[in-house]
Structures are given as C-alpha cells and as structure tokens.
Amino acid sequence: MLKYKGLEGKNVLVVGLAKSGYEAAKLLHHLGANVTVNDGGDLSKDPHAKDLEKMGLKVIGGHHPLSLLDSNPIIVKNPGIPYSVPLISEAEKRGLRILTEVELSYLISEAPIIAVTGTNGKTTVTSLIGDMFDKSRQTGLLSGNIGYVASKVAQEAKPEDYLITELSSFQLLGIEQYRPHIAIITNIYSAHLDYHGTLEEYRNAKRRIYKNQTEDDFLICNYNQRHLIETDGLKSKVYYFSTSQEVDGIYVKDGYIMLNGLRLIHKDDIVLPGEHNLENILAAVLAAVLGGVSIDAVIATLTSFSGIKHRLQYIGSNKTNKYYNDSKATNTLATQFALNSFNQPIIWLCGGLDRGNGFDELIPYMKNVRVMITFGETQDKLTKLGESQGKYVIRATDVKDAVDKVQNVIEPNDVVLLSPACASWDQYNTFEERGDIFIESFRAHLPSK
C-alpha cells in the first residue's frame, strides 16, 4: 500500500457507516486524517461504531447535523446516500470536496485497475474477468460494487496485481483522480433516475469512468451504443465488442468469437447461456487479454464458468435435462432475458410476490415454454397468462413442490428454468433463499451414487 500523504492532518467527514464507511474511516485514520463518522441511523449498539470509537474517532449517529460542515471537511460519502440529503446538498453549496471510498482505493495503490460499469452485466463481467485471472495464475482482486470494499482490497494489492472493480454510477460520481488502466462500459439504459434526476445525468456519471484515462489506457465499449461515448478530449485507446458487426476489438463471426482476427471458441461451446451474456463475455475476454491473461485461461473460463449464483446459474444436469437457477429475476425484464436464452423446450417455474403488475410483456418470449409451473401470490395471474398462450400449466405450493412436479412432466432435452419474474418475499426472506431451495430440491432428485 502506498503511504498517501494528501490527507494527512485534513478534516474528513465519513457520511454513512455501513461496510464501506467503516473501512474508509479506518483507512483515513491510518493515513493521518482527522476523521469524524456520521450516520443517520442509531449507532448506539453498532459494533463498527464502537470499534471506531475505540480507535479515537468521533462517531455521530441518529441525524446529520449541518454543524459537521463547519470545519470545511473533505466528505467521503456512502454511494447510496443521495446528493439531495440536506447535509450533502449543503456541502455542495459550500464547494466542499465530496468523494466516495473508491477514490481512496486509487490513491493508495499502485496496482493497475480494470473498472467495469454499465446498467446491466457489471457483476457478470467482473466475475468472468476474475475467473480468467485465476485460471491464468495471475492475481486479480475483485472489489467494489460486487461486494468487496475497494479501499480495503486496494490495501492488500501488490503493484503487479490487478484490481478488478465493479463500479456503480453512484460510486463514479465521487471520483476525482481515479484512473483505470482498462475501463469497460457494458451498456447504458435508463436507470436510477430517482437518484440522478435525468437520463443525461445518469449517462454523465457512467462516462466518468474514462475521464482521467491517458494514451496508455484502454476503453472497451458496446459497439451498438458507441454514440453514447463522448470523444472530445478522449485520450485512451477505444475498443469495441459486438455480437453482429466486425469491429476494432472483439466480435462474433459465423458463431465464433474473434479477437484481432484470431478465432477463439464457438459460442455453442460456452457454458454461460444467453445472447445478453455473450456481450458480457466479449467485454470480459477483451479486458482480460489486455490485462495479460493467456488465451488458454480465457478458454478454460468460457468452458466452465456457469454464472453468478442465482443469475441464470447453471446448477447441473439430470440425464439430458439442464437446470438453471435465475432466482434473482425479480421482474419481468430479467425473465425476458432468461426465456430468450434457450432454444430448447423450457419448463418454466415462476411466481412470487404480487406487486400489482401484469405479465403480458412476457408473451413474446414464451415461444419455447412447453410447461409452466406456478406458485406464490402471482400464481393465478401467471396461470391465466400461460393458459391464454396454450401452455400446459401446473400449480405448485412453492419452489420445492414445483421441482417435485417437474419430475412428472419432464421430457428429454427439456431445460428446467426457475425465473420467477417476481420478488420472493411472499414465501421467502430473500431471492437467495428461494434459489438455494431450488438447488437443494434439484439435488434431491439426482440418482443415488
């Protein structure tokens, strides 16, 4: 870790404790800053707050007093806290510096960074790159929005390692010098407008990922959205990925992934399903190769990586039937992607919390659905949907019962897909719990060895 001197003796206000705030506060203290931690919640029993107080840090919970700004501190803000919060908006009015802890990760580490942002696909791309580094026996450390605090991981990184960091638009708003060696924008669609205000502001936040790049750096973008990249002042080398066009970068031709004219692998030999995941794969392969990963390691990942848990996750086969866990599909858009990912007949397990919405937008994606098994509060709605499209529909009490009922109707080469299109809270505490039960139920039907 670099002994960064730029914060020594400076007043720093960490707003929002949580995991990233806790790690940022400890790091700032280590760097010699005068640290105050503030959180709107009750911290009287919070173990992290107590730990920071033992270190001599000032911790204030329960409210955000504006008097905390009187010392003109640098603010390190939890990315989830909106700029509309009075303390933050007042800090903006006063012209105070407002950072997120991901900026700290850059300031303290010499390790090059592969940074991934986008509306969809961030976690999958980040995880794919990490797996490719692992299989190449190079050190690639996952961090950021994927669940590992960037500033904590950066402290462990050696100069020869890579930091592979997933970044949200919230995190990117709070950077100043942050400069990834390789930046990826998977795609940009309308999202988080309650936070950013307008689509253009959201896009501008995403574009910050490449603003500090130099001629020695690389930017990887979706060719279909190349018009969203502002080229004025852009210094980095731009490469594209495309599933339909030959581009300067990586693309698909005659079913094969092509990199600089080199044929890597046929898409049918890739384990991770779905056309949307093919775009994620292209971006990850290009970034990994630019980072020094061998082609052999890339191929090893593509022929083994089955996805992020609960996100169109391949969980195994029973005879000729493959099972996929897409429990994280808590809305119809996610289920559209899932249903569109297979050419084989599908036994579709669906249902969950009723939020009052309909499901007609799924109809164009149901052509390969052979059987529907419905459960949860939306069971009646989804049953009617299936029957209206001439599908064979079975009612189940829950996910376990649905998997049990699969065994009565399954035929050779059917794909069994849990993609609920609904939140889990009517029957399960989390989508993870729902997905885990699906996996357990599948395993219970495997032949005994």
From Swiss-Prot:
Keywords: ATP-binding, Cell cycle, Cell division, Cell shape, Cell wall biogenesis/degradation, Cytoplasm, Ligase, Nucleotide-binding, Peptidoglycan synthesis. It comes from the Bacteria. It is found in: Cytoplasm. GO terms for molecular function: ATP binding; UDP-N-acetylmuramoylalanine-D-glutamate ligase activity. The keyword RNA-binding does not apply. ATP binds at G118, T119, N120, G121, K122, T123, T124. Its EC number is 6.3.2.9. It catalyses: UDP-N-acetyl-alpha-D-muramoyl-L-alanine + D-glutamate + ATP = UDP-N-acetyl-alpha-D-muramoyl-L-alanyl-D-glutamate + ADP + phosphate + H(+). GO terms for cellular component: cytoplasm. InterPro entries: Mur-like_cat_sf, Mur_ligase_C, Mur_ligase_C_dom_sf, Mur_ligase_cen, MurD. One of its GO terms (biological process) is cell wall organization. It is an enzyme of class 6 (ligase). Pathway: Cell wall biogenesis; peptidoglycan biosynthesis. The keyword Coiled coil does not apply. Belongs to the MurCDEF family. PANTHER family: UDP-N-ACETYLMURAMOYLALANINE--D-GLUTAMATE LIGASE. Cell wall formation. Catalyzes the addition of glutamate to the nucleotide precursor UDP-N-acetylmuramoyl-L-alanine (UMA). NCBIfam families: murD (TIGR01087). This is UDP-N-acetylmuramoylalanine--D-glutamate ligase. It comes from Staphylococcus carnosus (strain TM300).
